[in-house]
Amino acid sequence: DDWTDAHRCASLALVELDKADELLAQQGDAVMNQLVCFVANQWKKHYDRPDERVVCRLTDTLFAIGCADKTCAELAEELRGIYAEMPRECVASVGLMRRVAFTQSIGCACTGEVRGKNWDALYKLCEERLAAAKTAGGDQVCAG
């Protein structure tokens, strides 16, 4: 609420590792934990500024990114640029060192797309867009 009171809008993105269950089955818990930490650190490089940008882990493989003063289109463009430059492999150092390939799907939305300060509706819209990105094959940003 502070963001929407102090800024023109706020945007939210949900970011999830694609095929996480398959990765877990193939790689095991220890490698998966290392992969999730690697991914989290990649996003934290860009979105760990509490006054205007924040990233947090919601579940084992799901992250939320929030930005003040960005529309959905602006956040989506920024996310696409960052994701395009992000490594798509993590060097797992558990057991024998090996590269673990991964992709991510992202769904984002803006407070301007929902009525009032309805955070539940904003989250639901992000979930729908994340599902659309995954349904379309993953490895992409869906912004509506």
What does each model-identified segment do?
Residues 45-51, 83-98, 132:
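Short catalytic/binding micro-motifs of nucleotide second-messenger systems
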Residues 1-12, 18-45, 56-60, 73-80, ...:
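Conserved long alpha-helical elements within nucleotide-processing catalytic cores of c-di-GMP signaling
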Residues 30, 70-73, 114-117:
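A generic structural signal for alpha-helix starts
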Residues 25, 66-70, 87, 109-112:
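Residue-level recognition of strand-loop junctions within catalytic nucleotide-signaling folds
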